Amino acid sequence: YWRGLSGWNFYFLVKFGLLWAGYLNFHPLLNLVFMAFLLMPIPKYRLHRLRHWIAIPVGFALFWHDTWLPGPQSIMSQGTQVAEFSSGYLLDLIARFINWQMIGAIFVLLVAWLFLSQWIRVTVFVVAIMVWLNVLTLTGPVFTLWPAGQPTDTVTTTGGNAAATVATAGDKPVIGDMPAQTAPPTTANLNAWLNTFYAAEEKRKTTFPAQLPPDAQPFDLLVINICSLSWSDVEAAGLMSHPLWSHFDILFKHFNSGTSYSGPAAIRLLRASCGQPSHTRLYQPADNECYLFDNLAKLGFTQHLMMDHNGEFGGFLKEVRENGGMQSELMNQSGLPTALLSFDGSPVYDDLAVLNRWLTGEEREANSRSATFFNLLPLHDGNHFPGVSKTADYKIRAQKLFDELDAFFTELEKSGRKVMVVVVPEHGGALKGDRMQISGLRDIPSPSITNVPAGVKFFGMKAPHEGAPIDINQPSSYLAISELVVRAVDGKLFTEDSVNWNKLTSNLPQTAPVSENANAVVIQYQGKPYVRLNGGDWVPYPQ
């Protein structure tokens, strides 16, 4: 009654091939149990055939579970948003899932299996490989089944401008520092480290003054929050040398957005004055001192809210108000020219027109203080030009946006207005994709998605910064932005004869790269990225 695996041999061979190539989050024990179910001897042939019918949905579910594709929870949570996508965008997404090289390789594997199975009992080899994979999980606490680097030396980086130091076994996290990474990267140790990280972050905050000094200088703060822009996207689009980057005074080269979705990213930015909370804590009330714009309002800064879209998709505007504390009325959008149509068919307005409207409005409020939050959507996946259903080329849209920002910066310089512009992208657009996610898919907040080009530029200074931007190469996040704002909040640097740029940018808060969505967490541990899906075990992120 031992009938072998028959056609299921091909099922497991495909899995082994995908595992070797690094495309699977393989679960050896579950697959071994499934294989045992298929091999278990059943005398009656009808029951044997019934088993195969039962195995089909089980095998499909297990295959899905072994991939990096979004799980049922993620699909259900995002289902209402997916339903709002235009039909053209949905077809575009489906087309991206088709990997013709992979299909060709699977076809070759099918022919090879059919040919060799005439003389070889393939089941014996398939069972042997499955047993070997399970033995591997028992013989070592951490291993990788795909070609990747080996574990690196244990290093921890402390806060401020301190250099990286080798950690000792008894290290404890110091408030303001990143927790030490000394233990082997097992699931238990990574969970413990993540809990330590969040516990330390809860105690971090930016302290704003109770009031401004009498000689404080009024200025405007403009925070530009760009959707779908990471350093990886900039490189893929060939725009690393765009003049915009040289226009900044300060550039963050390792700024972590902490998430790969718009709503959570905006909330994190609006709550920048406290340490990084977990994803769940984003949707719980925070201390009043965490809200960056509320801290500024207490010092006399008038709040403004701008968007180049309606903010309705995914309840973005609602999240910004309820969880980000931004209660200001949305700036009037009537009469703005439409530059693009969003992935849900709603208009995306011309950003230069929006910025010029802001500039005109602020000029009416001379000698006052304002803080404006501006959210931009032109780079989001699926946006297209009016009258064209196909997604507009990312490079064309990015080039246009960078040109517009550069032109706006030039106009600000000519105006002489005292303005601090802070650019913080929400997250990347996954332009290149990787082994875990196709291009445009952001369910998992990978390092290439969450490492974003944040920058700061001061306008109207008596002694402006000259030369190349000051690069901040330490791992940073929103707390560093809040710290820069509080260091400039009295506005005195706009009128100083000489600005101490080293003092302004040194000892900024550092934050370990931890990124989280509802069902996925990615951390950097001992120089390597690790991912945890749906509360399961940690595995190395495929490189």
What label would you give each PLM region?
Residues 314, 358-403, 407, 430-441:
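Active-site His/acidic residue clusters
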Residues 143-385, 451, 478, 483-503:
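Active-site-proximal alpha/beta segments of enzymes that process anionic O-linked groups
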